[in-house]
Amino acid sequence: MRTLFLIGLLALGEPALAAAPTRLTEPAVRDFVGRQSKAWNAGDLGRYFALFAPGATFTDQGRAKDGRVVPYGTSTLAEARAQTRRARAKSKVAETTLISRIEIAPDGRSARVVAGEQIVLTTAGRARHLCAERVQTLIATPAGLRSKGQTDTYGPCR
């Protein structure tokens, strides 16, 4: 019965089910990260946060001069949305994402993405340059690729 239901949905052109990849590929992962960056830089927070799974978490941390990682905090998806809205009300943010590594799981259903982030944060006409390493895990869902969240580790720009 469930099979007939799924076939019926596909016959009706249900885009959510049709969007789920059977195996992740590097080009699909790169495209996803590109869509994230485009939505973020356009300030389209609805589109940006729609690319995350409901249980996604967002962790910020810093790297001390001696190499230690210093945790700043972790937010839920709802908390990250609210924090981003507040921050963007005061500042303009532009990020450049440079993917350094993509590791696709053997089953092809998830991928770990490591990227460098070059960030320009402009507040009251003053620009600050920040750099971070971002690590996120992408998963294949019936709605397409989604991120389980991200960990940004801020450190010196090189």
What are these regions (language model features)?
Residues M1-L4:
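Positively charged n-region of N-terminal signal peptides that target proteins for export
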Residues F52-G55, G62, A115-I119, Q136, ...:
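A mature extracytoplasmic/lumenal domain signature
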Residues S110-V114, A124, R128-R158:
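Short beta-strand edge/turn micro-motifs at domain boundaries
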Residues A80, T97-E103, E117-I119, E133-A140:
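Hydrophobic/aromatic beta-strand elements that line small-molecule binding cavities or substrate pockets
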Residues L17-L51, T74:
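Short, low-complexity N-terminal intrinsically disordered segments enriched in polar/charged residues
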Residues A50, P54-E103:
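A solvent-exposed, acidic/Ser-Thr-rich amphipathic alpha-helical stretch
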Residues G13-P15:
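N-terminal signal peptide c-region/cleavage motif recognized by signal peptidases
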Residues Q36, Y48, A56, A80, ...:
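Hydrophobic pocket/interface hotspot
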